[in-house]
Structure formats: structure tokens, C-alpha cells
């Protein structure tokens, strides 16, 4: 959900970050390394995709927003723009030094295929080993003029100070419930009570709210919450804790957005 957006105007919240990105694109003052720091489901991946799309767009508007119609935008929207590279990792919880060497260091020296920039998006960047981060240092210190690296993380605290000091940090704040509710009602075509419950459950993370709104588990979650609220006064503490844990477990299927 949400990844088919082709414009910053469609994003829920994060106006200050969008303004910063649009300004950088518009004035051509783009840094070589960014960290998008925010909780799971906060919208990091979407912002990174739109940032990359607008940097590569062949026909940007005066706000620095992507046109969504040129060849580059169409390629970016279907994830096959040759100069937007998403770094992957074999091991489930580690981005290794080999991943970084093969996918960034050895590749970044090759000029862009068809665009002004060559952009690397690194999801789960907090999984980079210390060796992987050290391997990146030289690249971040002396990047080619066309290179932009965007790290996505929910914990920027694990980066080495030498990496942090060379990146522009953009922190995603929780989005106000009312903003999420209005978005869900308009775009997911759901009634207000449904939208409010999704927004409350998402705790300021639009990506999570959108996934929840479309989730087949929604009715089940709703009845669990109502049951909990009705019985809360008569429940033993252990039962209460178990109920809350059950409700929180629905979160597992919400991938990062």
C-alpha cells in the first residue's frame, strides 16, 4: 500500500521533511548521503522513493516534485529505473561488508546509465555491520559527483559517529491522528469509526494505518479491542497483559513502509 504514489502531494504528514527535500531538489543543493530515521511504518521508504524519483525526473515542476509521466518517473514507479539501486542483503539480520562492497562501493564508480544522479537506497540500514559501515566511509567521504546514498533506519543510534557526521539526518515525527483519519476516509474509502481505530492503533505511523485499513484482520482486531475495553475493570492483570499482547501481535504482518 502507498508505494504507487507518484507525488509528494499525496504523502500523509511529514510536511517539513518534504519541504526540505523539495527545496534541495529545486535549488540543486543535494547532499551525497541522507539518513531517513523513523519507526517502522512511518513512511521512510515512500519518502526515499519519491526523493529518488524527483531527483531523476526529466520534467520536474517548480516545487521540485516529480512529474510522474516521463520515462524516468515511469521506470521509478515500477522499480526498474537503472540509476535507482536498492541495496539488498542475503542474511536476514545483517548487511555485510560484502553486500556493501558489491552493491555500492564497486558499483558507484560506474557512471549513471541514463540520469543525472546514481541513487542508492539502503533499507534496514541499522543492520549494517561495523565492518560494512567502515567500508562505506571512504565512499561517503569522497563520493562521485553524481552519487546519492539514502539510508533508511528505525534506529540511527547504531551508526558510527563517522558515518553520522557525514549524513544529513531527516527524522520522521509521528503524524497527527486527525491527519491520518482524514486521509484514510478519503483514500481508503472507509467510515470514520474504522479510520479512527486504525489511526489510534497506528500511533502516528501512516504506513501502518493504511495497511491496517486494508487488513482482513481488521474486524477481528476491532472486536478484540472492544472486548478488552468492556471487560477491563473485571480482568486480572495477567489476562489484561495477555489481551494487550494479542492485539499487539497483529503488528507482525505490517512490513516497513
Label the model's feature ranges.
Residues 2-131:
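Clamp-loader machinery-focused feature within the broader ASCE/P-loop NTPase space
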Residues 134-151:
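Conserved catalytic/switch belt of AAA+ P-loop NTPases
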Residues 5-54, 75, 145-146, 155-257:
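Charged, glycine-rich active-site and insertion segments that engage polyanionic ligands
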Residues 36, 122, 136-137, 153:
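Hydrophobic residues in beta-strands of the RecA-like P-loop NTPase core, especially within AAA+ ATPase
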Amino acid at each position: 500500500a502507498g508505494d504507487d504514489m507518484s507525488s509528494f502531494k499525496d504523502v500523509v504528514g511529514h510536511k517539513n521533511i518534504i519541504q526540505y527535500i523539495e527545496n534541495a531538489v529545486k535549488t540543486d543543493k543535494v547532499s551525497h548521503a541522507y539518513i531517513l530515521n523513523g519507526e517502522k511504518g512511518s513512511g521512510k521508504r515512500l519518502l526515499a522513493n519519491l526523493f529518488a524519483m524527483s531527483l531523476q525526473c526529466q520534467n520536474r515542476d517548480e516545487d521540485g516534485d516529480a512529474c510522474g509521466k516521463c520515462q524516468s518517473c515511469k521506470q521509478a514507479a515500477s522499480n526498474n529505473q537503472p540509476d535507482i539501486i536498492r541495496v539488498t542483503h542475503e542474511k536476514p539480520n545483517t548487511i555485510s561488508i560484502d553486500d556493501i562492497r558489491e552493491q555500492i562501493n564497486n558499483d558507484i564508480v560506474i557512471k549513471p546509465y541514463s540520469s543525472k544522479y546514481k541513487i542508492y537506497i539502503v533499507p534496514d540500514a541499522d543492520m549494517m555491520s561495523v565492518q560494512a559501515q567502515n567500508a562505506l566511509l571512504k565512499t561517503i567521504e569522497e563520493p562521485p559527483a553524481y552519487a546519492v546514498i539514502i539510508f533508511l533506519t528505525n534506529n540511527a543510534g547504531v551508526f558510527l559517529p563517522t558515518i553520522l557526521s557525514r549524513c544529513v539526518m531527516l527524522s520522521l515525527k509521528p503524524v497527527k491522528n486527525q491527519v491520518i483519519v482524514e486521509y484514510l476516509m478519503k483514500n481508503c474509502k472507509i467510515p470514520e469509526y474504522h479510520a479512527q481505530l486504525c489511526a489510534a492503533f497506528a500511533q502516528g505511523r501512516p504506513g501502518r494505518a493504511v495497511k491496517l485499513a486494508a487488513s482482513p484482520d481488521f474486524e477481528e482486531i476491532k472486536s478484540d479491542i472492544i472486548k478488552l475495553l468492556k471487560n477491563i475493570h473485571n480482568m486480572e492483570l495477567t489476562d489484561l497483559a495477555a489481551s494487550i499482547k494479542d492485539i499487539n501481535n497483529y503488528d507482525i504482518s505490517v512490513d516497513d513502509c
